[in-house]
Amino acid sequence: MSQEKYIMAIDQGTTSSRAIIFNQKGEKVSSSQKEFPQIFPHAGWVEHNANQIWNSVQSVIAGAFIESSIKPSQIEAIGITNQRETTVIWDKKTGVPIYNAIVWQSRQTAPIAEQLKQDGHTKMIHEKTGLVIDAYFSATKIRWILDHVPGAQERAEKGELLFGTIDTWLVWKLTDGAVHVTDYSNAARTMLYNIKDLTWDDEILELLNIPKDMLPEVKSNSEIYGKTAAFHFYGGEVPISGMAGDQQAALFGQLAFEPGMVKNTYGTGSFIIMNTGDEMQLSSNNLLTTIGYGINGKVHYALEGSIFIAGSAIQWLRDGLKMIETSPESEQFALASTSDDEVYVVPAFTGLGAPYWDSNARGSVFGLTRGTSKEDFVKATLQSIAYQVRDVIDTMQVDSGIDIQQLRVDGGAAMNNMLMQFQADILGIDIARAKNLETTALGAAFLAGLAVGYWEDMDALKELNATGQLFKASMNESRKEKLYKGWKRAVKATQVFTQEEDADDDAK
């Protein structure tokens, strides 16, 4: 067998871990996936067992080798991408976590976040970290664990405990405890990292009483952090040389290297990230400012908008309403709709994300008539995804002053041609669907490969994930704006409905 060299990407997600082996053309050669248990101790709490995450990663590494007959010695480098914000604290000597990993979705630390807001720290934290104060980010999760595990604060102050997001935990495990690092993109999601000065922020650490010794060293997204311990990589001592949080890895995998380039991943929710270049731009409109990636001594900042419900709206049609049997079927139903009636579905099942950040909003439907069909309802649900993306894109253009020309897309719902065409129409710009939709893992592989010379430079990557299909806007301007104004009215009415409910409760 030829000793061709490859890059392995470890993609550690919220519900499963994957290992994917890529060749020099950026093609997937082998992959393995393993789910792991979700832990829900109380309503709104979401936790993982960090050792189960590690076990799942070991399993998929083996699986990728078994499927392909590729040997560990053929792996030139490893890239890691991960669910962001999820927090692990472990014993420095034994490597044993002192509590479950608190997952990014978990709301158990919301009271800590609310207290920070009430104490007037919103502006300071926003200006330093680019983030809003929220339980979403790692800072409140660290504080919660130190508060709730007996003796944890004292042990942390003695230097006996280490903190890490999942990237840090995996590197620490793969190197058998030799390396305690994170990267710019993951550090930027902790709410402890000053993204302007590129340092852990002493004022925020003091405010939350988090000992600095717990924190990992912050590195660029593409450099050799360490090598795998041979017994953790089937005899191979392989450089770990690329790391990025999942959405930033997708930005890199989409080759969005220039300011103004934007990608959207249509997953359960939708995550829209714009490369804003080397200038940190704080949003005035509820978008997050973060670090896209740092490479070759230069940091690229980004604006991010999160939409809570995208692909999960299609799952709702399938599992909740039983209107469709499979998710891909939604496209055929939508195309069969012959009505021009303006039906709007506002899928605020868990509130509205960017740019509204209205956690009280709930789902609603407007514009139904006796003539409304199942096909019309399915079409309106798909269109709601595109309308929400426009909400964020319009806001990004205002915040950045950049006129967006193209949206690069990936994720499961990006395979829906009807949705992609409507997305192009309602935005009035081109939609470029990646040829390789594995953009998150590919981004981690690219970062790792660049650090070891597997790919020469970023220009060499541009041929490796070309546009698979381009969707061009074809709707006339007046129709486009009429539809979008209807959407804005529907969102406003949805918010008013829950506001009036709150007012009724207050009156009681």
Swiss-Prot record:
Keyword annotations of the record: ATP-binding, Glycerol metabolism, Kinase, Nucleotide-binding, Phosphoprotein, Transferase
GO terms for cellular component: cytosol
Keyword Transmembrane helix (UniProt): no
First-tier enzyme category under EC: transferase
Alphabetized SUPFAM superfamilies for the sequence: Actin-like ATPase domain
Domain of life: Bacteria
Binding site for sn-glycerol 3-phosphate: T14, R84, E85, Y136, D246
MF annotations from Gene Ontology: ATP binding; glycerol kinase activity
Pathway assigned to this chain's UniProt record: Polyol metabolism; glycerol degradation via glycerol kinase pathway; sn-glycerol 3-phosphate from glycerol: step 1/1
Residues reported to bind glycerol: R84, E85, Y136, D246, Q247
GO biological process, one term: glycerol metabolic process
Coiled-coil annotated residue ranges, if any: none
Activity regulation as described: Activated by phosphorylation and inhibited by fructose 1,6-bisphosphate (FBP).
Cystine pairings recorded for this chain: none
Enzyme Commission number, as recorded: 2.7.1.30
Family the UniProt entry places it in: Belongs to the FGGY kinase family.
Classification via PANTHER family: GLYCEROL KINASE, SUGAR KINASE
HAMAP family: Glycerol_kin (MF_00186)
Protein name: Glycerol kinase
Species name: Streptococcus pyogenes serotype M3 (strain ATCC BAA-595 / MGAS315)
Gene: glpK
